[in-house]
Amino acid sequence: MNQPSPAIPFELAGPRRVVFGPGTVHQAGALAAGLGRRALVVTGGNPSRASVLLEHLRAAGVEAKVFAVPGEPTIELIRAAAAAAKAHSSDLIIGFGGGSALDTAKAVAALVTNGGDPLDYMESFGRRQPLMRSSLPVIAIPTTAGTGSEVTRNAVIGSPEHGAKASMRS
């Protein structure tokens, strides 16, 4: 008779709130309005897919600026997205798309409040500095399944200069 494996203790830190189900994107405007008034919406390579989200944000009084992520996030792309968020005076970041859009959103939310460069906070090839301030609020709306980016604090970012990817924990 097989003996059950002993329980291995662990701790799981997840998102504060998960809203799940068909059509829940229709709640995004009201949810966003409770967190901020000026959102940077980070999308995948086809920003028109976010049109329903943008309609709900407008209806809820949230001013949105769209930043499209054409592929996997890189250090340069994160810098550009953070600059767009600052120029828009964003107080909320919304990721809408696959893992690349969601990872970009999380990294931008951390950079806007902490300042500096993505390399300051990157593991492996970065300076590994801790983030000292809380990130801007983030709403993650996955449109694909697979990465689980919506339930982690990690943002995986590539650096062509280093020939590698590393995490930035928001």
Question: Language-model segments: which ranges?
Answer:
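Fold-independent oxyanion-binding glycine-rich loops
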Residues: 22-23, 43-45, 96-98, 141-144, ...
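Glycine/serine-rich anion-binding loops at beta->alpha junctions
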Residues: 90-108, 143-149
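Short, hinge-like loop/turn segments at secondary-structure boundaries
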Residues: 58-59, 82-85, 111-113, 155-158
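ATP/NTP phosphate-donor binding region
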Residues: 1-92
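A glycine/threonine-rich phosphate-anchoring loop and its flanking beta-alpha core
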Residues: 113-170
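Hydrophobic/aromatic beta-strand patches that form the interior of the parallel beta-sheet core
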Residues: 65, 94, 137-141
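N-terminal loops that bind phosphate or other acidic moieties
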Residues: 87, 108, 126
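Short Gly/Thr/Asp-enriched flexible loops that form oxyanion-binding sites at enzyme active sites
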Residues: 53, 82, 101-114, 151-152
